[in-house]
């Protein structure tokens, strides 16, 4: 009887550990979110000095990662090649762990303060795309 109880308890513990492991694996399998921003800059010098460093600092602090930088100016920016239609002059692609993380950054007081500066020197078009698993 004691042996059967021990075996049953061991099996129950194994099922519980397995369920937790499966949930953990499922949580890790969430695809990233990509934020695409097309930028039309009207004052490149002020944009580069007053807005870009502040915005980049908020992105890094919130866990965002730059995947691609394209267009005129900017450190490390590459050319944007139009395949079909007209390419924007500048574009940035960021990677975020989740839509919640992206929106928390976007709505943060720090980024909104930086954005007010950026809107003096540029217009932005943004959209988020969920990555594939």
Regions from the PLM with identified roles:
Residues 54, 109-110, 118-121:
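Alpha-helix boundary/capping residues
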Residues 1-8:
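Bacterial Sec-dependent N-terminal signal peptides
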């Amino acid at each position: 009887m004691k042996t059967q109880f021990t075996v049953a308890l061991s099996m129950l513990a194994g099922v519980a550990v397995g369920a937790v492991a499966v949930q953990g694996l499922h949580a890790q399998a969430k695809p990233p979110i990509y934020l695409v921003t097309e930028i039309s800059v009207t004052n490149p010098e002020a944009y580069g000095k007053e807005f870009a460093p502040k915005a980049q600092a908020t992105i890094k602090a919130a866990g965002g990662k730059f995947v691609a930088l394209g267009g005129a100016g900017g450190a490390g920016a590459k050319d944007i090649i139009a395949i079909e239609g007209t390419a924007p002059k500048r574009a940035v692609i960021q990677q975020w762990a989740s839509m919640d993380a992206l929106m928390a950054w976007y709505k943060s007081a720090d980024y909104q303060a930086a954005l007010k500066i950026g809107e003096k020197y540029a217009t932005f078009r943004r959209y988020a795309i969920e990555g594939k698993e």
